Amino acid sequence: MDEYIPFDDIVRQYDPDYTGKVSIQAFLEIVDDVDALRLNPEAPLLDNEQRQSAQDFIKDNSEIVVSTSEIKNLFYELTGLDPDTLPVNKLALRENGVLPRKSVAKPQKISENRIKRKDMFYQDASYITPRKGSPLSHSTPLSMFRTKNEYGSNKGFSHINKENADDSLIQQLYERIELQAAELRSKDEQVKELNARNAKLLEELDSSEEACKSCYTQAKTWEKKFREALRDSKEYAAQLQTIHEEYEQQQAHIVRMEELIHAVEKERKTETDYMKKESLSEQKERGAFMESNMILEEKVAHLQLENEQLRLFFKEKAPQPFQNHPPYQNLKITFPSPFFHIPYIPKTETLNDSQFAAGLSLLASELESQKNLLKKFENLKKKSSKDFLSPSTILSNAFSKVSLPNSLILRVLFFSLLFIIGIHIFYFLFFHVATIQQWPFLFWLPSTKFDNRWSPT
């Protein structure tokens, strides 16, 4: 039969006044006593760290007084072992003089009560149960009473006959004795039945104590698991708080980026609207120029027709030339007019004809200028569709608008200043974007530290 360490008796040694409570300062001594009585200890019950933490706790709470159950709970939390189910070393137990507990460990008070009930039961039963040799349940048989058949034959009752004893009284006493014996037998059967019931109840009590003990152990196990789950939940809560803070930082960064994108889109939209307005104005101007060109072409055609008619008219009615006058010849107009030629008119022409020729030449020059202007607009439209926003066009426009100094030294200084400003702008934009995006080459630089404010989680 297994024997276990009497934990309650060890605790009771530190309670001389039998108050049921001991000081917390005796906890480590109790643990050492239990460790000394253990069977085949592989390692001490408390390691250095647990013992140091227990000493610190006892030092801070030296005035605390705890009960035996609280001592057991503290022992279970520190060691993870049930103090009532530790096997005992019999040799060490004899040396210390503490009685072991057998079978399954039970509370000491319940075991003593059960033993007292059993002792009382068997002690009472020894007096109630009748002896086999005596039908009257008495240690000394009543030999003075005999049956009716033995009355006359027994010599021991001769003095009764001589004294004229009453036979009826003897018969009544005998009947009363038999009645009491029957009652005693019935009571004996009742006592046996009660003994059986009591034994059954004791077995049920033992099983209930076993179930209570297992429930207590299971409750301690669940309490330990609950403490571990509570500790894990605290760690998860701290991690969740950290993730929430990082999420808020990411949200703030996203909001700032959205504002920046919105500002860029707004600026781009403004530029697009401006370009659309300029393109619409250019289209309107081009349409107006085309309309004016068509009108001028119609006028030119009409003038050419009139010119042809006038040429034929002058050819028919032209006067004979003088002898000293140069022959009839065609002369070109001095101002540019690639469309037609006006014939030579002699000096005898009228004033109206000279005015008409001057107006015709003016119209021709205006038509030529309008055509040149239309060609320039067509070339400008073709270039604007391809390289209006190209860097070369922007630079050429910028340099065309900037008035550069004539001196060579001033030009060199000006271009050097532009180069330095461009290098600074490129450095700022490049490393600013690289810092936000956290490109790996930044970690190679000695003066650059890792920034984890916007790191993804």
UniProtKB/Swiss-Prot annotation:
It comes from the Eukaryota. One of its GO terms (biological process) is mitotic spindle pole body insertion into the nuclear envelope. InterPro entries: SYNE4. Keywords: Cell cycle, Cell division, Cytoplasm, Cytoskeleton, Meiosis, Phosphoprotein. It comes from Schizosaccharomyces pombe (strain 972 / ATCC 24843) (Fission yeast). This is Karyogamy meiotic segregation protein 2. It is found in: Cytoplasm, Cytoskeleton, Microtubule organizing center, Spindle pole body; Cytoplasm. The modification Phosphoserine is found at residue 134. The keyword Cytoplasm applies. One of its GO terms (cellular component) is nucleus. GO terms for molecular function: spindle pole body-nuclear membrane anchor activity. The keyword Cytoplasm applies. Interacts with sad1. Transmembrane segments: none annotated. The gene is kms2.
